[in-house]
Amino acid sequence: VKIHGTNNHQDHAGVGVALPDALQDYRIKKLKEFGVNAYRCSHNPPTPELLDACDRLGMLVIDENRLMGVASTHYEYMKRFMLRDRNHPSIISWSIGNEEWGIEGNIKGARIASTMQAYTKSLDSTRAITAAISGGWREGISNVIDVMGVNYIGQINTDEQHKKFPNQPAWGTEEGSTRATRGIYFDDTKAQVMAAYDKKPIPNFYSIEDGWKYYA
């Protein structure tokens, strides 16, 4: 199965974060119409009703932890949502964290990620572990995680990473222009609008065409 995924926050336009169950179904159905088959929950565990919709409608899921760490509270957070969610067949991976900039690229991050990964596997050994990384390569989390999650691929030399870790799979966990195009026909960085998504908004972001070359 080839992953065609999207990175999604829990809120919905015009509604906020308290979504009725019918809107969970609506969202998953619309994503499937677009050709999407995988849903990354960012940056926290989802409501169970979303996972029910993914199970029912056939959407793969990356279920994500809110905060990395090795204190008892961090373990309790992981345990709580994993025990709640692990019987959902839609879940294909557990994410232990997102963009932990202070520890991504150092030995402290590698140790924390290794410890969290081992703990996660003690609760569920059937799914791969990932973490979404944004810039902290080479010496940290990316060295020890099962599946490397890449946020903003313009920040990493993928050939160098693959050469160093040839057996480590990777997937894109977050990309975005952080701009809007609806009803817009000009570029205005201050207003965060752009004429079209096939343009490169800022240096470390890629246009759609630029980004495709990194994905199989």
What do these predicted ranges mean?
Residues 7, 47-50, 137-138, 155-159:
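Short, well-ordered alpha-helical microsegments
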Residues 1-114, 118, 129-130:
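Active-site-adjacent substrate/metal-binding segments within catalytic domains
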Residues 25, 75-79, 154-155, 209-213:
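Structural motif corresponding to alpha-helix initiation and N-cap regions
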Residues 1, 92-94, 113-123, 130, ...:
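Substrate-binding clefts and catalytic carboxylate motifs of secreted carbohydrate-active enzymes
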Residues 89-92, 98, 133-154, 166-169:
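Aromatic- and acid-rich polysaccharide-binding/catalytic face
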Residues 58-66, 146-153, 169-175:
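Short hydrophobic/aromatic-enriched beta-strand-loop microsegments
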Residues 57-60, 80-82, 145-149, 187-191:
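Short, hinge-like loop/turn segments at secondary-structure boundaries
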Residues 66-67, 99-101, 134-135, 153, ...:
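Catalytic metal-binding/acid-base residues of hydrolase active sites
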